[in-house]
């Protein structure tokens, strides 16, 4: 799979946030967006995900206009997206099933990612009982549980200590080795 964004622009009211942004990558590769706070990184991600449209430009998958309903995205948002008072395993299974996974596949993927991220002991806990770093790891499990082809990570190292930052780097390398777009 190849991904290309060409000439993306976005304005909010009279403020231009993006001007002519172009990106290109393919499966088995990582693409990073670096920039200052407010530079438009998250806006670019949200346009790619279809949260809102670009004012101009195009997004292509394998040379064709993107059809988001055919792309299995995994998205780790900058802000937390899970319910703090709910049991972790229940949330993860629910999210996987929303994305079309069978219960059996969802259970298998959940157990795999919880173990891989050293979080298996926490699956029956509520999210708000975990540290910020462990909450981030659970959010990553939610991102990966449906085996996405295209993984978008917004501020993925937020709240992670050096050991868990290395663990995340290892997981990203595994995703790349599996042919994912990261």
Language-model region placement:
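Catalytic Walker B motif of ABC-type/P-loop ATPase nucleotide-binding domains
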Residues: 151-155
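Helix-to-loop junction immediately C-terminal to a conserved catalytic motif
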Residues: 49
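Conserved ABC transporter NBD signature motif
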Residues: 57-71
